[in-house]
Amino acid sequence: ECLGIGNQSISCSFYIFHDYFKQQCEEHESVIYFALSSAASGQYQTANLVKSEIEEENPNADFHIVDSQKFSLYIAQTAVHAAQMAKDGKSVDEIITECEKYIKTWRCYLLVDTLKYLEKGGRLSKAAAFVGTMLDIKPILTIEHGLVESLDKLRGKKKLLDKLIAKIQDDSDFDAENPKFLIVQSNEDKGQEVCEKLRDEYGEDCIEMYGEFGPLIGTHVGRGAIAILVKIVTE
C-alpha cells in the first residue's frame, strides 16, 4: 500500500497444502486442521481435495478437516484448546466435537479505522462507505454464519474504544463473572490501550491471547483495526 500497489489476497495453492499436510500425516498419528470459514475462503475446499489425495497415497493417514466458520484468533485459540485436550488424552472425535462447541463460546467485536478496505473487498457498498465516512459512522462488525456481518454502529471519532467496550459490557451474553478476552489488532498503540482498559476493569488475567492481524485479514480490515473476542455464556 505504501508503494501505491493495491492490496489483494489469494488462497493457498493445492500443492503447498499437499506438501505440508502430507508431511504432518507422516509425522503424526492424527492431524486436525481448523480451516478458515468455507463461506468466505476457498481453503476448506482446497484442504478437502488435498485430504482425498493424501488418503489415496497413504491409507493410514488420519487427517481431519473442520470448517471453523471463523477467522484469525478464533482459530488460534481453538487450536490451543485442542492441543490441551490432546495432551489430556482425549480422542480425536472428542477433540473435534468439543472444539466445534468451544469456538462458538467467543463473540467478535471488530472496529475498523477506515471503511475503504471493506468497500474494496466487497463487504460494504460504495454508497454505504461514502455515507458512513461523511457521517463519521464506524460499523462494529462480527462473524456470523461464517461471514463478516454488521453488529452495530458507533458515531464520531472520540472515545471509540470506550464506546466499544461499553457495547461489549451491555451484551446480555457477556460473561461478566468470568470475563475473558482475545485481542487482535493492526495498530499496536490501539491494541495496548484496549488491553490496559480491560485489565484495569477486570484484572491482569482477563486477556487470554493477544496478537496482530496477519496479511490475509489485514488486507480486508486495513490499518488501525482492532477486534475484541469476548467469552460469552452459551446454553
Where do the language-model regions lie?
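N-terminal glycine-rich anion-binding loop in soluble enzyme alpha/beta folds
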Residues: 1-16
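N-terminal glycine-rich phosphate/adenylate-binding segment common to multiple enzyme folds
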Residues: 16-47
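Structured helix-beta-strand junction loops
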Residues: 2-3, 27, 102-105
